[in-house]
Amino acid sequence: MAHEGCTQLTYIIIAPPEHADEGDRIFRSHRAWMRATHHRDGEKALLSYDLSKVPELSNQLDPNSEPTGNTIFVLSEVYQTYAGVDDHFEQAAATWADFDAMISWFDKCDTTLVPSARILYSLW
């Protein structure tokens, strides 16, 4: 399903080796919390939730280059409208047990956070 006009939240987190396991733990908790709390229909609907994980490479343009030891986590959530993102953040602060742990973990990693962006182009 194409998502043009919907709203995307994207986080890219580069975790040093000593913090990668905490990322795994946080995202397991996050997925369970998302599944239990998020809307599936209407203007607040969560349309997709994807987390990917890969070793960081010394040369990102060369898939055969040596790993740095860091781990890259990429989180993408797509919502029907901005209202879904607003609801997400309100719920996270109020009900997710690991919200503070995630914020603390971000401080230990190299993070790029895009909390709310309109999707311009989308296929299928």
Model-derived features: where do they sit?
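N-terminal soluble domains immediately following signal/targeting peptides that reside
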Residues: 70, 96-100
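Short S/T/G/P-rich N-terminal loop/turn motif that feeds into the first structured element of a domain
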Residues: 1-74, 78-91, 104-124
